[in-house]
Amino acid sequence: MRRKAVLLTVVLSLSGGSAQAMGLLDAWELALRNDAQLRAAGFERDAGQEEVAIGRAGLLPSLQYTYGANYSHSKVTQRDRTLNNTTKRDYDNYVSTLTLRQPLLDYAAWARYQQGVTRKLMADQRFRDRSQDLMVRLYQSWSEALLAQEKLMLLDAQRRAYQEQLALNRRLLAAGEGTQTDLRETEARYTVTEAQRIEQEDTLDAAMTDLENMMGSPLQIQDLSPLALDTLPDNVTENRSLSQWRELTVRHNAKLAVQRENVDYSRYEIERNRAGHLPTLDLVASTRNSLSESEYNYNQKYDTQTVGLQVRVPLYSGGAVSASMRQAAAEYQQSQAELDNQTRQTFAELRRQFNLCANGAAKIRAWQMSVAAAEEAIRATRQSVAGGERINLDVLMAEQEWYNARRELTEVKYRWLQAWLNLRYTAGTLNEQDMMQLAAWFQSAPVINKTGINAATGNKTN
């Protein structure tokens, strides 16, 4: 029922009229259904489920039926001392065989079965990784779009301020109180702002395109619920030390789990090749019907049932088995080295994200103070210009510092949320509850359709 309500809300928010911003959870629900990368991972997982059955088949009985029918024409000559007797034969013959084979001792088949189990587990872990990665990719594109929009708003405000400054410079120049230098400095700043605005428009378009691809629906920036996080919550690292997060990572990180299964797969590959030196033992049972199978049993019908054991002992294969074992052993060492490398990289990324989370609150407070100080600097600089103590360039630089501080404050909030998400993704514990917590830090206005009905509650709005 919750998913149906979410989808109804999303559909109404994407339709025309006065629909308001959708929430991050709504977007996630759509992405779960429509993201091509996740769907591909789902098919890969489904294919991986069959690896166990394929490997198990080598340990189970096999039943085979063969039938052959022919028409034969032969000439039989019998010699005695005085003459040759020739007889012509035209006849039908057939052979029908049903064979049951049950492996009793087949080390290669056992190794292939174990490899099938590891491949199935690898497919499961890859799908879990893609599911968690979808949350990360969705937030990344979501935050990039909102951040680009906020930067555009700041650039628009900055552009308006420069336009006002240009108008003031022109009035002062016309009155003989200004200079061409002041005018050109302001024009240069205004031109740079225009270029930065174009760059942010491109960034916004790219982020919105990524969101549309994930969600499978067209979007406008107005559809996205904005960030509503002024101060960071307490306990951002869940009272866990870095070493505790490392322990979680070893147990739950999907990429490490895939690599460990790959090591096991390589180990069983060694055993599979070792089987080339070992005998196999099969139980074989068959029933065979034949008529005139050859000239020696012409016009004779046989019904034969047999049960027995069949042993195959490899003696020599030109050195291929030994070479294959050496190759598999080298690949096993390679997989272990890749696991070590993946573990080190994962721990390094975990430390980076942990530090970003732990230091996020201090960074946000510092940039909030920087914004407040920049606002005071603008007011003081303008008063000094009016008193003749400062020049036009000082005002432009003070305004630039304020816009830079505002931009950094906005970016550090989004970066902290990204680190909060990445910390749990790297540890392998990222789940739906984390996504719900993340969505709670974004404002999500109720969706109002064209009839004035709140899509979430069903109540009439005034």
From Swiss-Prot:
Q: Which UniProt keywords apply?
A: Cell outer membrane, Membrane, Signal, Transmembrane, Transmembrane beta strand, Transport
Disulfide bonds, paired cysteine numbers = none
Instruction: Write the signal peptide boundaries.
Output: 1-23
Task: Tell me the compartments it is located in.
Answer: Cell outer membrane
Main localisation = membrane
Q: Does the keyword Transport apply?
A: yes
Q: Which family does it belong to?
A: Belongs to the outer membrane factor (OMF) (TC 1.B.17) family.
Q: Tell me, in a sentence or two, what this protein's role is.
A: Involved in the secretion of proteases A, B, C and G.
UniProt-recorded name of the protein: Proteases secretion protein PrtF
Gene that encodes the chain: prtF
